[in-house]
């Protein structure tokens, strides 16, 4: 595995550094007893930024490590690892999840039964 950052990892790193600064600002807001709704809005903004960083990392993983694992015959292990990594990430796996504009499909068992023609 390369130790040089990909463009996507660099983008995720920049997002995280921005989020860290934003969190520092929210802490200052709380310390100065800012209005709760204002704090909540800022927390939502940071949460969105973290979710975007996570999507960037997912795309990076799919383009690098995951595709290499599939090409090396380790596809099922890579799939299992990826499922484990995203199972607690509603922004990636929830019913309204979108990855680059594509809606995440339901597993085949979740499809409604079709009536015979």
Swiss-Prot record:
The keyword S-adenosyl-L-methionine is assigned to this record: no
InterPro entries xrefs: Metal_Tscrpt_repr, Metal_Tscrpt_repr_sf
MF terms (GO), sorted A to Z: DNA binding; metal ion binding
Subcellular compartments: Cytoplasm
Keywords in alphabetical order: Copper, Cytoplasm, DNA-binding, Metal-binding, Repressor, Transcription, Transcription regulation
Domain notes per entry: This protein has an antiparallel four-helix bundle architecture that represents a novel DNA-binding fold.
Known partners and oligomeric status: Homodimer.
Protein family membership: Belongs to the CsoR family.
The protein, known as: Copper-sensing transcriptional repressor CsoR
Organism: Mycobacterium ulcerans (strain Agy99)
């Amino acid at each position: 595995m390369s130790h040089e950052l990909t463009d996507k990892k660099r983008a995720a790193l920049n997002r995280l550094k921005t989020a860290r600064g934003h969190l520092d600002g929210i802490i200052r807001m709380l310390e100065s007893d800012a209005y709760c709704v204002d704090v909540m809005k800022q927390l939502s903004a940071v949460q969105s930024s973290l979710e975007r960083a996570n999507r960037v990392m997912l795309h990076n993983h799919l383009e690098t490590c995951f595709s290499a694992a599939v090409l090396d015959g380790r596809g099922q292990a890579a799939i299992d690892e990826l499922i484990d990594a995203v199972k607690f990430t509603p922004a990636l796996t929830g019913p309204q999840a979108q990855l680059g504009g594509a809606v995440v499909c339901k597993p085949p068992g979740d499809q409604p039964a079709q009536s015979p023609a």
